[in-house]
C-alpha cells in the first residue's frame, strides 16, 4: 500500500472537504442565530413559536431545490435534523422555525 498522507490530490481534496465542513458549521450557527431572533420576535408579538406548516414547506422546498447527489429522502432527513437542532437551540421557549 502506498502512503496516502503524501498524496497531493488526496491532501487537496481533504482540504476542500475541511473548508466545506467549516462553511456548513458557519451556516448552521447563522441559522440558529436567526431562529433565536425570530423566536424573540414571535414571543414579543404573541405568535405561536412552532409552525409545522412552515417546517414542512422548508423540507419540501429543499427537496425541490436539491440537484444531487443526495436523495430527496436524505434531504428530508438532514432538513428535519436541522429543524430539530434549531428548535432545541432556539432558547428557553424551544420553538421551531
Report residues per predicted region:
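Domain-level signature for soluble enzymes in the chorismate/prephenate branch of the shikimate pathway
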Residues: 1-97
